[in-house]
């Protein structure tokens, strides 16, 4: 019973760290819980993806898929406080404006948004909206999307998995990056979560991080082609971090999450158009 209670606490600690969703008061907080709670990051993504899907489903009947997705994206930004988007913006400023490791880390730490950050986050959000919009446009769908001759339940399930995968799988790969690289700073906001991450935590994160992706591939095998976009992007992000700062920071993890999520959104264009 104590173990179950601890795991519940770890989930809420992770959710409180990554989002603005309030947790029950009885959860409490201990700093060492942050490290153990990181395995629940994909689970939080699973929840966020489900909530985003619900908002999208609600508004698409009123405004169509493009506006509905934009609203759902705004809803998610409110829930998370643009936590990962802020990291992506700082990452763009650091990598774009710094030539030395110390300069890059200093720029990333600066809370002000620079030209690279503003341009990067604008393009990122635009790619998300246009990617999903183009996917729906290919089939000229105004109601339930992804009509492949299957039942309405499969349509709903496919879209739900699409949204959940974008949020959970991207957070799983963000955790994986923590295992592949060391923490780049002596101190930082993400350091309590980053220390001593182990493979059992990675395996646990697979439950909610990888399962939705595999389920979507099972329903629509062509979605496996999305890895042609995801893997090179992940490797490129890894190479940038290893080359320029010899590790990762919290901003880097946010950038990885956002890049992979965007890859998943735009993958719908060349995956479902092939079916």
UniProtKB/Swiss-Prot annotation:
Coiled coil: none annotated. Its EC number is 2.7.8.26. The keyword Cytoplasm does not apply. GO terms for cellular component: plasma membrane. It holds the Pfam family CobS. Its cofactor is Mg(2+). Pathway: Cofactor biosynthesis; adenosylcobalamin biosynthesis; adenosylcobalamin from cob(II)yrinate a,c-diamide: step 7/7. It is an enzyme of class 2 (transferase). It is found in: Cell inner membrane. Keywords: Cell inner membrane, Cell membrane, Cobalamin biosynthesis, Magnesium, Membrane, Transferase, Transmembrane, Transmembrane helix. One of its GO terms (molecular function) is cobalamin 5'-phosphate synthase activity. It is a multi-pass membrane protein. PANTHER family: ADENOSYLCOBINAMIDE-GDP RIBAZOLETRANSFERASE (PTHR34148:SF1). This is Adenosylcobinamide-GDP ribazoletransferase. It comes from Leptospira biflexa serovar Patoc (strain Patoc 1 / ATCC 23582 / Paris). The gene is cobS.
